[in-house]
């Protein structure tokens, strides 16, 4: 068993060897909480949830840090529009993140640092860069000198010469280079007091890029095993993180960089200007979060993902069928604390785990889950209890532990619905088809359940997703 990761830095698939045995440090760039969480965010955090789940499944200990950029120009602007304190606005959308992430069944990080909680650490980081001659001050603003870091552009495969040739902007504000970026921003007129902190260079607040470097080094050390986010962060954000971190420490900042592909909506880029920008809250009014999570797993994380009505409906129907198969299985056998001894199931388990070992290929892993579903359907007709117990264990391992899409137990139907189901089954036995159809319509249309009829005459109810 060796996990392989496509490393953005080398643009190659590399074998995964963390720095310290089975301990893995992982830093994922979090949201800027000025608006509701959207579909693009969902893909990032589901992708890294699969990474974390598989690392845990393979026996690693994972220290996962995910930040909140809770001070930012967008937060200040939006809070002023809403006549709120920036901290109040940020807290609203931080809470929204946790609600929507919970609905997507995303495992929690070990820590969620906020920028406003780590200003002293950020200031100290900047001071070291200034003291080493890697950053300079202009009127209370501090800039990182990109020219001082010879490897600038190695993540995004750019170089300063090409950047200069393609640049449309000249040097402004007295900067040494147009590509030097802000580490500390002097307080502007009319900015709220609560986004202003004292520093050796006067009152101000951190720039965006320095925040992640300072927080990650404080909580995970100078070198991180895994770092990543969406592809849009490769340049300039992650490029600048590398520059300031490696310039400060002289050490490799990140061993393995992981970036997920963009989300499009019906083949168009998701954006507010095109009116195809969907918050998770709005999507979840129409689609079950489990369906959305399943759909996000149907493509390899590095590929673009098109979110379409046809695609999500297909995912809904597929997941509904899986739920029905699983409910039939758990109605036939309760035990799952068994060893996988049947060779075909052991081989299938190996194939499933190997798919995730190979750069966390959820698309391929799902194909083995579907293969398992077929074996369960066949087993329900012919298999004994031991075989069914193994099938149940494997399904819960694949769909639950690894992929996070297993039907929750609380979705079982309540007593009133079971009574309606009994009425329908009695009507069917008596060949009272009109009454059977009436109750069926009541269960499906008014109570939101699907009915799965078994060959032995019994039926199961599954909450529609």
Curated annotation (Swiss-Prot):
GO cellular component: cytoplasm
InterPro entries for the chain: Cys-tRNA-ligase (IPR015803), Cys-tRNA-synt_Ia_DALR (IPR015273), Cys-tRNA/MSH_ligase (IPR024909), Rossmann-like_a/b/a_fold (IPR014729), tRNA-synt_1_cat_dom (IPR032678), tRNAsynth_Ia_anticodon-bd (IPR009080)
Catalytic reaction(s) noted: tRNA(Cys) + L-cysteine + ATP = L-cysteinyl-tRNA(Cys) + AMP + diphosphate
Binding site for Zn(2+): 29, 212, 237, 241
Example of a GO MF term: ATP binding
Cofactor note: Binds 1 zinc ion per subunit.
Domain of life: Bacteria
Annotated residues for binding of ATP: 272
CDD domains cross-referenced by the UniProt entry: CysRS_core
Cofactor requirement: Zn(2+)
Primary localization class, coarse: cytoplasm
Keyword S-adenosyl-L-methionine found: no
One Pfam family matching this protein: tRNA-synt_1e
Enzyme class name: ligase
Positions occupied by motif 'KMSKS' region: 269-273
Subcellular location: Cytoplasm
GO biological process, one term: cysteinyl-tRNA aminoacylation
EC number per UniProt: 6.1.1.16
Motif ('HIGH' region): 31-41
Keyword entries, A-Z: Aminoacyl-tRNA synthetase, ATP-binding, Cytoplasm, Ligase, Metal-binding, Nucleotide-binding, Protein biosynthesis, Zinc
Protein family: Belongs to the class-I aminoacyl-tRNA synthetase family.
Subunit composition and interactions: Monomer.
The name this protein goes by in its record: Cysteine--tRNA ligase
Organism: Endomicrobium trichonymphae
Gene: cysS
């Amino acid at each position: 068993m060796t996990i392989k990761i496509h490393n953005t830095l080398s643009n190659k698939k590399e074998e995964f060897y963390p720095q310290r045995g089975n301990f893995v440090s992982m830093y994922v760039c979090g949201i800027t909480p000025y608006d509701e969480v959207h579909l693009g965010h969902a893909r990032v955090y589901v992708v890294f949830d699969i990474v974390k789940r598989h690392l845990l499944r393979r026996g690693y200990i994972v220290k996962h840090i995910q930040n909140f950029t809770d001070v930012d120009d967008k937060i200040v602007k939006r809070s002023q529009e809403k006549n709120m304190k920036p901290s109040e606005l940020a807290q609203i959308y931080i809470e929204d993140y946790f609600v929507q992430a919970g609905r997507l069944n995303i495992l929690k990080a070990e820590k969620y640092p906020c920028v406003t909680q780590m200003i002293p650490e950020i200031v100290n980081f900047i001071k070291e860069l200034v003291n080493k001659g890697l950053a300079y001050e202009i009127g209370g603003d501090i800039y990182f000198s990109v020219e001082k870091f010879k490897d600038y552009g190695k993540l995004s495969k750019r170089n300063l010469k090409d950047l200069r040739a393609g640049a449309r902007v000249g040097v402004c504000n007295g900067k040494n280079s147009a590509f030097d970026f802000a580490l500390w921003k002097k307080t502007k007129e009319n900015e709220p007091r609560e986004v202003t902190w004292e520093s050796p260079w006067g009152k101000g607040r951190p720039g965006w890029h320095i925040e992640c470097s300072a927080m990650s080094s404080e909580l995970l050390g100078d070198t991180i095993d895994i770092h990543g986010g969406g592809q849009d962060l490769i340049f300039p954000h992650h490029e600048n993180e590398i520059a300031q971190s490696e310039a400060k420490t002289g050490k490799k900042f990140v061993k393995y960089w992981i970036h997920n592909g963009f989300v499009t909506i019906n083949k168009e880029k998701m954006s507010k200007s095109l009116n195809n920008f969907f918050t998770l809250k709005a999507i979840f009014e129409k689609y079950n979060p489990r369906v959305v999570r399943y759909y996000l797993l149907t493509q390899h994380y590095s590929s673009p993902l098109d979110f379409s009505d046809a695609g999500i409906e297909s995912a809904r129907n597929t997941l509904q069928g899986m739920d029905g198969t699983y409910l039939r299985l758990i109605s036939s056998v309760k035990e799952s604390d068994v060893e996988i001894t049947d060779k075909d199931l052991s081989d299938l388990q190996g194939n499933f785990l190997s798919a995730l070992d190979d750069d966390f290929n959820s698309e391929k892993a799902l194909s083995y889950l579907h293969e398992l579903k077929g074996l369960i359907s066949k087993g329900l007709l012919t298999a004994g209890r031991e075989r069914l117990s193994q099938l149940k264990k494997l399904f819960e391992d694949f769909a639950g532990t690894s992929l996070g899409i297993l039907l929750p137990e609380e979705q079982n139907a309540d007593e009133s619905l079971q009574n309606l189901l009994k009425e329908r089954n009695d009507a069917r036995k008596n060949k009272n088809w009109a009454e059977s159809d009436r109750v069926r319509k009541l269960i499906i249309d008014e109570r939101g359940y699907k009915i799965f009829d078994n060959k032995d005459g019994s039926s199961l109810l599954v909450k529609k997703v």
